């Protein structure tokens, strides 16, 4: 640890070769001092420089890569660990475009054992979409990490703030700021927040089930925001409404007939419906309960599953339903068993019954559709589930989950990194999905769960 006689706080940048340590050093120092290239191990010596972070002078150390198979690796590793021991704070940099290997984790834990005043810095997260990759590094066991992109100057400001807080240097010195420091503060200004997304909702169903009536009922009071856009009567029609601060765009798709009856222009309509669903987040499946369900209803419902959409079942014409409530619900549960997670709303579009409930349910389902499970909590639930019902063996060989990571949302997508991913049986996957639904309430939301070995995860 840093000794009391030192006047400057010291920050060491550690990590394996070619993860961006020297680039981060140059970014913080605002000068190209260390050699940077795509060739692993270009930094052999420890580069030192006094720099100013938001007006505070600190000493920054850039170390050689700690790769196991590098030349002079033992000497470099020993030098790095000594630098770690003498520093006040360590920035351990990893490559966010790669899945961590066992060697990554082993080296990090060795550094952390030497000096627990350590930040895990995940570099090369160049845009918001790539943030999903960072969750693979939950296996390092750090409660907080920092996603940055040195080349795009993303996340640097937040990292600097955290560094100053950790070093108890969190009060910016206002006097005697020179031009370079002012420039640094400007360059590291926080990034603008992304604009809130419009919820895209596709209305699907057979012909004459009441899709257009539902659209009219949903947009009756708010349709002045966006006027109807239609090329022909078989084109999807867009309408946007505002619920509180949330915009919702509805797409009324063309009604779908039996395939044998789809000819000419209706084939075009089906293609347009497919394209409309490709950009949708949620599907409203409209079912006509004035008569029994038909096979085509089930086939149309598979469109939502095909496009991995959130889904809400709308039972229209409820005022003239063909059977009592209990009978219809029992039939619905039997015929649409694969949509048991979908909420069901009864309505009469012509009488505007339960229309507000549909609007608010869309927002609720979208929140579930966009949900991200905290990585530590996700792994805790998966661990408990596998302990409660252990994974079946694979020909007498142990099957285990190393860790789980949610790598995407809309819909939630989770990878299980396993020693034998092909041994994950469909029934056990369903058990894990049901467990996650029970714990985290993924209402109306498909959950995608896949199994990978470490090598496959690394390649992705």
Curated annotation (Swiss-Prot):
Chain's gene name: der
What SUPFAM superfamilies does the annotation carry? P-loop containing nucleoside triphosphate hydrolases
By its UniProt entry, which Gene3D superfamilies does this protein fall under?
3.30.300.20, P-loop containing nucleotide triphosphate hydrolases
Residue sites binding GTP 1 per the record: 15-22, 62-66, 123-126
Record GO biological process? ribosome biogenesis
Q: What family is it from?
A: Belongs to the TRAFAC class TrmE-Era-EngA-EngB-Septin-like GTPase superfamily. EngA (Der) GTPase family.
Q: What does this protein do?
A: GTPase that plays an essential role in the late steps of ribosome biogenesis.
Under the subunit heading, UniProt states: Associates with the 50S ribosomal subunit.
The chain's coiled-coil residues are none
Which PANTHER family does the entry link to? GTPASE DER (PTHR43834:SF6)
Residues noted as binding GTP 2 in the record, renumbered to the chain: 205-212, 252-256, 316-319
Report the protein name in the record: GTPase Der
Q: List each copy of the KH-like domain by range.
A: 371-455
């Amino acid at each position: 640890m840093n000794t009391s006689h030192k006047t400057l706080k010291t920050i060491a940048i550690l990590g394996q070769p070619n993860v961006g340590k020297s680039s981060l050093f140059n970014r913080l120092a605002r000068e190209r001092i260390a050699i940077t290239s795509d060739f692993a191990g270009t930094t052999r010596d420890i580069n030192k420089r006094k720099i100013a972070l938001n007006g505070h002078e600190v000493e920054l150390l850039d170390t050689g890569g700690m790769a196991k198979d590098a030349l002079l690796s033992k000497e470099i590793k020993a030098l790095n660990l000594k630098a770690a021991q003498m520093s006040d704070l360590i920035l351990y940099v990893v490559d966010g475009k790669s899945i961590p290997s066992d060697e990554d984790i082993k080296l990090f834990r060795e550094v952390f054992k030497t000096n627990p005043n350590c930040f895990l810095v995940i570099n090369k997260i160049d845009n918001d979409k790539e943030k999903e990759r960072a969750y693979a590094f939950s296996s390092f066991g750090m409660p907080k990490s920092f996603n940055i992109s040195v080349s795009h100057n993303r996340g640097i400001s937040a990292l600097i703030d955290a560094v100053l807080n950790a070093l108890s240097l969190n009060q910016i010195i206002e006097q005697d700021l020179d031009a370079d420091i002012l420039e640094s503060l400007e360059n590291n200004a926080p990034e603008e927040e992304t604009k809130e997304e419009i919820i895209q909702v596709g209305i699907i169903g057979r012909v004459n089930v009441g899709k257009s009536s539902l659209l009219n009922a949903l947009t009756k009071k708010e349709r002045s925001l966006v006027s109807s856009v239609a090329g022909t009567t078989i084109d999807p029609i867009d309408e946007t409404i505002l619920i509180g601060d949330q915009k919702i765009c509805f797409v009324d798709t063309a009604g779908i007939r039996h395939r044998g009856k789809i000819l000419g222009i209706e084939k075009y309509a089906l293609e347009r419906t497919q394209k409309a669903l490709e950009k949708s987040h949620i599907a409203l499946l409209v079912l006509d309960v004035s008569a029994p369900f038909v096979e085509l209803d089930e086939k149309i419902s598979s469109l939502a599953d095909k496009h991995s959409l959130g889904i809400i079942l709308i039972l229209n014409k409820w005022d003239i339903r063909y059977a009592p409530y209990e009978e219809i619900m029992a039939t619905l549960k039997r015929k649409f068993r694969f949509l048991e997670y979908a909420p069901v709303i009864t309505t009469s579009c012509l009488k505007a019954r339960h229309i507000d409930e549909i609007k608010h349910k869309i927002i609720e389902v979208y929140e579930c559709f966009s949900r991200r499970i905290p990585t530590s909590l996700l792994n805790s639930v998966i661990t408990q589930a596998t302990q409660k019902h252990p994974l079946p063996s694979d020909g007498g060989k142990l099957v285990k989950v190393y860790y789980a990571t949610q790598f995407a949302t809309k819909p939630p997508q989770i990878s299980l990194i396993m020693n034998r991913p092909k041994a994950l049986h469909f029934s056990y996957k369903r058990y894990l999905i049901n467990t996650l639904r029970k714990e985290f309430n993924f209402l109306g939301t498909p959950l995608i769960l896949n199994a990978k070995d470490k090598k496959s995860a690394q390649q992705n």
